Amino acid sequence: MSSGRVSFEFRSFAIHPQDIPLTVLVRCAPKESFFPLVEQVYGNFEAMQVPLQDPAVQKAAEAASSLPPAQRYPALSDALKFTEFFAARGVSVDQAHACLANIATATDVANNAKKYGEAGINQTPTLIINGFQLPSEQSEWPKIAEALRAAGAR
């Protein structure tokens, strides 16, 4: 596999409503920041969910959901403290709001979520090798390596 004969494609999959602004915000940054930001999101995911337990945040998120599309995701991101999280990592508040107001990007993320959901993808991570979806219990590296070798990787 270290020979370069295996290629890896990462596709972000929004399962929950709050995943849409997260996915859009990761795409906001320069390309070279994409994977470092993804790692930051996954590394801090539990902490990022804490605001969801706060009734005031829940109320603000619900209010954001009723806004017009171009205002919805900036307001949701602000309510959930995502804008603040990304600002600390180089995506300014203005840049974040501009990206989140781009309805085409948010719609693309939502459409992909629907398409992947209809294809039976319902969790992250989901690994697909040559069209075959690995069972979730095979998401550890030794099992992935075994599946890659079975698919022809050397």
Question: What annotation goes with each model-predicted range?
Answer:
Residues 1-73, 117:
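Structural alpha/beta surface segment adjacent to cysteine/selenocysteine redox centers
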